[in-house]
């Protein structure tokens, strides 16, 4: 990412220059709706993210310039303020400061400007990138980096919970902090144990297509979580030792099927299927079998669409278009009901696929979808 504009705006605003830090957005190749079921997710950091320029100012004041924000891009707050800032974007930074202070870091005042190339609303977690960039920078500046990476990821999650009203899991922040070039991370959402797997798809590209729609979730998320919890309760009562669907198997689920609605049963079965798919994809990557990876991505999409019912016509249309174009793998990425599809595409069909997807989607829905090609990159870091 070119930092010239950031450098110039910082110097114009604050009359000096600072240090540069970067934290990436993320993709999740497979492992969807598994986090709150104690399962595995399989994210990776991408080459798009948030870049921060920052300089200690020797006071208790924090002075912020959000270059990409049109309405009220400049804001100040005191580290002694007990109330979070009014601007939503500043709450992320205020929260990171407060969470670092809870962990014994003596955060001082600073001037900062930031910009990013993570498309907002595309499901690549721009908010986690922002939290991680400031957590990494402030930890380096005021604590000589003594707060470890696990804790930095937890600081981002706690910021969402305590200052932004979002009860998220830890995957987004974890991927942003722990990302490694050429690798995906299999993260165990129960134990937070993790393992890197090589992702170097020679002859393939990772392409995200933004449907540009976001249907209201309403109570949909809670309904699906409740379905999983009903199945867990029945299996635990009958077999014992079932705390989440991670602890269950197909035989257990079949044994309690009569006590579940059809929707509840299919949703629980999807989670069991997805657990197996994540493990299969890890093995396929170790063997360099990207065709099998793609096959499992399609299976995940149609499981999310037909069993977990979190897709929508627009996303199904994009995945069907991918299949017709011979794309290796495609699925909805994220919570569903809109957002992006993630596609594993051979170089030889990429241009044909993206042009057809844009043309056919615009013809059907009257919206031109945005397309982003991403590369798996490193996590939070100081830039030279």
Task: Indicate where each model-derived feature is located.
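Gly/Ser-rich oxyanion-binding loop with an adjacent helix/lid
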Residues: 1-21, 27-30, 36-40, 77-79, ...
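Short, charge-rich binding segments
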Residues: 43-45, 53-56, 87, 104
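FabD-like malonyl-/acyl-CoA
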Residues: 129, 340-344
């Amino acid at each position: 990412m070119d930092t010239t504009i950031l450098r110039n705006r910082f110097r114009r605003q604050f009359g000096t220059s600072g240090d540069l830090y970067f934290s990436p957005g993320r993709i999740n190749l497979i492992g969807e709706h598994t986090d709150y079921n104690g399962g595995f997710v399989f994210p990776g950091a991408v080459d798009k993210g948030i870049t921060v320029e920052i300089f200690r100012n020797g006071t208790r004041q924090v002075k912020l310039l959000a270059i990409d924000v049109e309405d009220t891009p400049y804001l100040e707050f005191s580290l002694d303020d007990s109330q979070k800032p009014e601007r939503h974007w500043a709450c992320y930074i205020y929260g990171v400061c407060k969470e670092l202070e809870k962990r014994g870091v003596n955060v001082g005042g600073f001037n900062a400007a930031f910009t990013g190339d993570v498309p907002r609303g595309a499901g690549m977690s721009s908010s986690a990138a922002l939290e991680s960039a400031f957590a990494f920078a402030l930890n380096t500046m005021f604590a000589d980096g003594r707060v470890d990476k696990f804790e930095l990821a937890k600081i981002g999650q706690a910021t969402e919970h305590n200052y932004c009203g979002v009860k998220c899991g830890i995957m987004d922040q974890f991927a942003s902090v722990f990302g490694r070039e050429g690798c995906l991370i299999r993260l165990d959402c129960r134990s937070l144990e993790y393992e890197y797997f090589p992702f170097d798809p020679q002859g393939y590209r990772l392409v995200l297509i933004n449907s540009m729609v976001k249907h209201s979730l309403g109570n949909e998320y809670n309904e699906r979580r409740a379905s999983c919890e009903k199945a867990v309760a029945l299996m635990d009562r009958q077999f014992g030792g079932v705390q989440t669907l991670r602890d269950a198997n197909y035989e257990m689920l079949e044994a309690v099927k009569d006590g579940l609605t059809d929707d509840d049963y299919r949703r629980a079965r999807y989670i069991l299927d997805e657990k197996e798919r994540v493990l299969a994809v890890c093995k396929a990557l170790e063997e360099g079998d990207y065709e099998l990876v793609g096959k499992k991505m399609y299976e995940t999409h149609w499981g999310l669409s037909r069993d977990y019912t979190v897709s929508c016509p627009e996303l199904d249309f994009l995945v069907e278009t991918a299949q017709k174009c011979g794309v290796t793998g495609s699925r909805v990425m994220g919570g569903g009901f809109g957002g992006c599809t993630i596609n594993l595409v051979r170089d030889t069909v990429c241009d044909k696929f993206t042009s057809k997807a844009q043309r056919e989607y615009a013809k059907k829905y009257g919206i031109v979808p945005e397309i982003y090609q991403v590369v798996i990159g490193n996590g939070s870091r100081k830039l030279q």
